Amino acid sequence: KNKTNKEIALRTLKFIVDRQIVKKDPTCDFSGLIVGTVGYLKAQFVFSKEWNNCVKVAGFYSANGEEYPPQVLDETGSCYIPEKALKKRSFKIQVFGKREGYFIPTNKIEITQDGGRI
């Protein structure tokens, strides 16, 4: 059975969420990102225990704060990065967790698509 791009991302950007701080996973290569990607990039988050039993949503923003469509994370802590976010040289990611009587946001982290420049 053939899989579509929506079923398989070819590249995953990995992040670590410790309490309210989101940061790039130091074992993940964030270099060589090219502006204009569609259906290729996913974000995946690993969470500390404060996030247990929360519905988790990733927020995506332009460098000047414009909000792109938020994405609910799946059971692996992953989501596709919205096409609109990937049209600019840089974008920001923030994560939110919610359960009854509980809400936890993170900081925003900026991702730069360096166009393959070294």
Labelled PLM ranges:
Residues 1-117:
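N-terminal assembly/attachment segments of tailed bacteriophage virion structural proteins
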